[in-house]
Amino acid sequence: MIKKVDHIGIAVKSLDQTLPFYTEELKLPLLGIEEVESEKVKVAFLEAGETHIELLEPTSPESAIAKYIEKRGEGIHHIALGVDSIQGRLNELKEKGIRLIQEEAKIGAGGSKVAFLHPKSASGVLYELCEKKGEE
């Protein structure tokens, strides 16, 4: 079951250059910054009411975010939906013929379990399913 829009992921070239707009101009509280080595990104989470904004900076030219920025420029990368039982939800979607980028959840920022749906199954939108750590 989808519980909420967990966050909106935005690809950026530099957190140092981008963060002041969000924290000083928009006055969004910075919740934290962490590196997700497996994805070759550094992420910053900001609180925006009931949801969050995730800024993603590539740490390597080989990262998916670096390739995204090179092809499309900076901007909205994905919408993350908070779910219960991510693996069960992935199995249901696969059975219904929905294309998945990952058939098995992996560990993402903050220890959350995450997996992406293929944009070709969702009108061109990249959706991430996200199960927060401790909410299994």
What are these regions (language model features)?
Residues 1-39, 63:
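Long, hydrophobic N-terminal alpha-helical segment
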Residues 1-17, 74-83, 133-136:
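N-terminal beta-strand motif that seeds the catalytic metal site of vicinal oxygen chelate
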Residues 5, 12, 22, 46, ...:
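Short, structured motif recognition centered on aromatic/hydrophobic residues
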Residues 36-52:
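C-terminal "cap" of GNAT-fold acetyltransferases
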Residues 44-45, 81, 90-136:
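Vicinal oxygen chelate
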